[in-house]
Regions:
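Right-hand nucleic-acid polymerase module
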Residues: 1-120, 131-287
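Short beta-strand->loop micro-motif that forms the acidic, two-metal-ion catalytic signature
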Residues: 124-127
Length: 287
């Protein structure tokens, strides 16, 4: 078994005053550093769980570090495209977006997570920005009443090429960012052999979190910020407008208390405001 010395804590800046604190778990050596097990010794189940965790982390990063206009739900009409071949759909969708960038003269960006129906067909959920106002329009009859009443928009170019879609203007960026991570499921991760790398896909370039600091001595205030437990680490998302880096880490405890506030979704957030079929998906076990 091989091991390497790793930090006890790591802090990443997401922008807009948002930071992620990570406290790593493991066995301490006499010098208070952590020893972490090499990936080569991990079981397949552990690796799959790690893939799932990494994918969720990256989706949340992209969701929080970039500005988005709409929550997007896109389906695939069997008469227009093969709904069962995700690779072909992703390739065609990427080319479709490149074509629309030229048509609209706009830098369209997207972050999308595929979801599989029980019959094996695919559809997608995600975030999108850069669509000009004249590319989208309100739903009109005979569209379902919930789409018209809910203020959802149609992207006709997508609908003509692939099938039904809906766009919901984003009103709560934090809650929407956390909501989209729910579609990165462990079941999707375990089907990785069938879908390759496509736990999610996105346009380029997108901004990612930037490492602000590594801390190699245990720090109690940082540890207490980490409220999410995982197999190998604990994490916490916080607001800290005045949390300036590089910070004074001369000792194991900070010189002064810095006011930090947890980044959490609004408990009153209603998913049906961005996902018109939320209740149906929930009943079918997708959420």
């Amino acid at each position: 078994m091989t091991s390497s010395v790793s930090p006890v804590h790591s802090i990443h800046e997401y922008g807009n005053g948002i930071y992620k604190v990570v406290t790593f778990k493991g066995n301490r050596d006499p010098d208070n550093a952590y020893l972490r097990t090499s990936e080569a010794t991990q079981s397949n189940d552990t690796k799959l769980d790690n893939n799932f965790s990494r994918a969720r982390n990256m989706v949340l990063q992209y969701a929080l570090c970039n500005s988005w206009d709409y929550f997007f739900t896109g389906t695939i009409d069997r008469a227009k495209f093969d709904r069962f071949i995700l690779d072909a759909y992703q390739s065609r969708l990427s080319q479709f977006v490149r074509d629309k960038r030229k048509k609209y003269q706009s830098q369209i960006q997207y972050l999308l997570v595929p979801e599989q129906h029980k019959d094996g067909a695919w559809h997608i959920h995600g975030l999108i920005s850069g669509l000009p106002e004249d590319a989208v329009s309100p739903f009109v009859p005979p569209a379902p009443q919930r789409l018209m009443d809910g203020g959802f928009l149609n992207w006709s170019d997508y609908m003509d090429t692939f099938g039904f879609c809906s766009l919901a203007p984003i009103r709560d960026a934090i809650a929407t960012a956390y909501y989209i991570t729910k579609y990165v499921s462990k079941d999707l991760s375990r089907r990785q052999a069938d879908i390759g790398k496509h736990l999610y896909f996105h346009s380029r370039p997108l901004r990612k979190a930037v490492k602000a600091s590594d801390v190699y001595l245990y720090n109690r205030p940082l540890d207490e910020l980490c409220v999410n437990e995982y197999d190998f680490c604990k994490t916490g998302m916080v607001y800290g407008e005045d949390w300036i880096w590089p910070y004074d880490w001369a000792g194991a405890e900070p010189a002064e208390v810095i006011p930090l506030y947890p980044v959490v979704p609004d408990p009153d957030f209603q998913p049906m405001t961005i996902e018109p079929d939320f209740q149906q998906l929930k009943m079918e076990g997708y959420l």
